[in-house]
Amino acid sequence: MLGGCSSDSGLMECAIRRFTLITVVAVSLWATATASASTLLIVGAGDGHGVGMSQDGALGYAEHGWSYGAILSHYYRGTAIGVAPEHTVVKVLMGSKVKGIALETYVRGVVSAEVSSSWPMAALEAQAVASRTYALTAHAGGSRFDVYPDTRSQMYLGKAAETPSTNAAVAATTGQIVTYGGKPAITYFYADSGGHTESVQYGFPGSSPQPWLVGVADPYDNGPLRKWSVSLSFSAARAKLNGLVKGSFKGIEVLKRGSSPRIVTADVLGSKGRTLVSGSELAARFGLYDTWAYFSVRDSHGTHPEPEVGAKKTSPPPAQPAQAISSAPVGAAGGSAAAPEGGSGAPTNVGGQGGVSAG
């Protein structure tokens, strides 16, 4: 006689109850084991925020014979080359103190820190002009200082890091900056576009659209992080998304993409609801190189793409020729897009660039 079953008439009913209980427990344990065995697969492209010039792309264009002016015109649409005001001093926050550095001296200490000195001269010259322009337009610290000496703005390592080739690129472009409508145009840059750059309003949500910072195809960007992938167990994914998952983790649903198409917004799916997140927060939580990413789930039944409601991809604007150099100094910075400060949520910056890219 089964314990708790006091009569023959109740024996069958009791056995059924126990069988049902055992079945429920077994199914629950199986479901838990299945969830823990599921894997979140992430396939992505690029390294950085994707807005403006890709350093690996500039390298590729230079290797294909493009001039620095053509490279800059490709990434910063409708721009021209102008001349910076004379005797410009860049205010750099060094520790707790602000140091004033002459513009050309500052740029020499940046270019050698941002890209490899072995790159073709056109790529180094494009970097020099972009970095010089960024120094004039960033205003990271308001009126107190202009730039940080690191990836929050752009890398600056000073005279000790200078090289003959990068100094030659700075000298060859002395005073030259990127302008739009006769004013300095903020020149964001980063390591690798993944094959397409991003429009500023999608790369930095909350920023106003700018006509020179639009997404363009980038076929000559062939850096080491043009394509990458990551896999995480569901338990590891949930741990990284701590505070965002309601109930048990079920996956990611992308709601909106930019033109590249980097993620603008997505939902973290849980058994008890969903949580809206930005693409940059999602990249930061997972430690991704870029917000250009696609998600799928692999389990015992196979691999399943995550549900997605994506923005339509837009065709890139037509290529534009390099603009002529103007000899007159230009005035205040154009546009209204402030330089976003701090990290981008990936191992790169949101200001200028996130360190030297391999190539």
Where are these predicted regions, by residue range?
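Conserved, single-site charged/polar hotspot
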Residues: L2-G359
